[in-house]
C-alpha cells in the first residue's frame, strides 16, 4: 500500500547529467524511469516537473550577459527537452505519459490545464509538466509548487543528490546533521536553502508538504512511497 495516492515529483535537471558535465546521461535517465515505473505500478498517480540546469539555466545566463527574460525562456525550453527524454524513457518501459507544457507548443506537448492533468493521471498516465510556470523570473521549484497545489497532490517529493535537509551543507561541513522532519517556519528561521522562498511559501500557504530525499540511489522512490524514513519531511 503506497503512503501517498497522488504525488508531484520534482527532479533536478542537473541530476540527469549523471557523471557527465552537460546534457542527459542515458543511464541516469533509465534509472529514474525504472524508479517511476515501480511506483506507478503501485497505483500511485504521478505528476513530474524536471529542471533544465543540465542544459541551460536562465539566472546563470543573465550573469553572462543574456537578457533575463530570454534566458529564462531558454531555460523553459531546456525543461521541455528533459521532459521529452523522460517521456521517451518511460514509454520504452510501457508506461503511458503525457507531456503538458505551460506555453503552447503542440505537437511537442499538450497545453497544460489542471483538469486535463488530473483526468490523465486518473486514467493511468504519468503527467510530465514542462516549461515551468510559462513566465520568466520563476524557478522550476516554484513551478513544482504551483503544479503540486493545482493537481491537489498529497505531497511534493523533491528528488535531489542529498538524502535530506541538513543544518548546513553536508558537502562543505562534516559536522552538519540531518533533520528527520522540519517545519516551514524553522526553514525560514535557519535560512536553509531547500527551495527558493517563493516556492517554499507557496507550499506553506497551501498546506503542501515536501519530502526531500536522494533520488540518485536506485530504489529510494519506492522506499519513500512505502513509508521508509530516508529523507526529510517538511510540514506546517
Each PLM stretch: what is its role?
Residues 1-236:
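C-terminal catalytic "cap/lid" subdomain
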